[in-house]
Amino acid sequence: MDWIQTAGAGTQLPENNIKIAVFGIGGAGNNIIDDMLRMHPELQTANVQFFALNTDLQHLKTKRYVQNKAVIQFEESKGLGVGGDPQKGAVLAHHFLEQFHKLSDSFDFCILVAGFGKGTGTGATPVFSKFLSNKGVLNLSIVSYPAMCEGLKAREKAAKGLERLNQATDSFMLFRNDRCTDGIYQLANVAIVKTIKNIIELINLPLQQNIDFEDIRSFFKKPAQRLENEANLFRVTNTFTFSFDAHNTIEHFSHKLKNFEYEGFFDHKVEGAQKVILKVLVNQGLYPLDLTQIQEIIWAKIDNHNLEVQLGVDFTDANPSVQLFFLMEKKQAVSSDFIQKPAFISVKEVNQKPAKPFQVLNDLKELGLKYVKQQTGFNY
């Protein structure tokens, strides 16, 4: 065990050695992990490691920033991929389990990132997740669901993959590719990278009113015993962030949270959520926050009197902010609404006759470009 000296006290305390692994599985997962290390190389430390796993050696070689790479292969497969077949992806993953055990053995928390709808991510992710769960390792999966333009076959593969994943993982987040416009999947990478970064910092950066690792485990962990009517429910999580300043007030926070389902990329409404992690960073000199008012806005949105809350509070020199993680149990892996109108479109527009497909795409394109401008500062 490692120890640190406490100044002036003459005592020693053990260091926080919680180890986190982030595995990008398949092409989409590899892309996200590589983007993450390009944008945030400081996140990789002795206790936080990133891995790219793929059946396609050619694609794996194109990743420049992730150093830990492994080919999911077995004899005759030769790193040539699986041709979009999830069954082949699962078979190769089973053959790879001994190596996966060596890669994942020392970690306390594993995040699996993949695109669903093709072969490697859809087939291998549930296999790796089940392996981790059987070992008692906390694991969260962050996966994407194909847009309609990617074809119904891809959606069928993804839906079956989600059913297998739900039986294996502790919980999962679902990103909807149909929320991207004109196939701008870089938006997906930005959103998922931010989410992973927030989770890592939630675990590794202590707060004045702290959220410890056991709090996080109890939030994400699937109960050992579930009632019969709960066994097939999908345990999905979602995340929300908001930073306050002179132009982003408590009223804007309330509006954004109320319209959360229309403005984000992750699937599922949060009404009726069972659990919430609420992390608040306070700077009262820059922008005073009323924590009670913030909580009341959240309670009104979720509308569940049995809500379990883990609250963490700390001080910051930057703009104050709120981070929320929700956990819900749903009957469906993917919410039934396909594409909804953005919240800022007027009621008059909504009441008009249904939009033609190209009109919907143009609306979504406008929404996506506004998001890119907001996130990057670039003007299109």
Swiss-Prot record:
This is Cell division protein FtsZ. InterPro entries: Cell_div_FtsZ, Cell_div_FtsZ_CS, FtsZ/CetZ, Tubulin/FtsZ_GTPase_sf, Tubulin_FtsZ_GTPase. The lineage of its organism: Bacteria, Bacillati, Mycoplasmatota, Mycoplasmoidales, Mycoplasmoidaceae. Homodimer. Polymerizes to form a dynamic ring structure in a strictly GTP-dependent manner. Interacts directly with several other division proteins. SUPFAM superfamilies: Tubulin nucleotide-binding domain-like. Keywords: Cell cycle, Cell division, Cytoplasm, GTP-binding, Nucleotide-binding, Septation. One of its GO terms (molecular function) is GTPase activity. GTP binds at G27, A28, G29, N30, N31, G119, T120, G121, E150, N189. Pfam families: Tubulin. It is found in: Cytoplasm. PANTHER family: CELL DIVISION PROTEIN FTSZ-RELATED, MITOCHONDRIAL DIVISION PROTEIN FSZA. The gene is ftsZ. It comes from Mycoplasma pneumoniae (strain ATCC 29342 / M129 / Subtype 1) (Mycoplasmoides pneumoniae). One of its GO terms (cellular component) is cell division site. Essential cell division protein that forms a contractile ring structure (Z ring) at the future cell division site. The regulation of the ring assembly controls the timing and the location of cell division. One of the functions of the FtsZ ring is to recruit other cell division proteins to the septum to produce a new cell wall between the dividing cells. Binds GTP and shows GTPase activity. GO terms for biological process: division septum assembly; FtsZ-dependent cytokinesis; protein polymerization. Belongs to the FtsZ family.
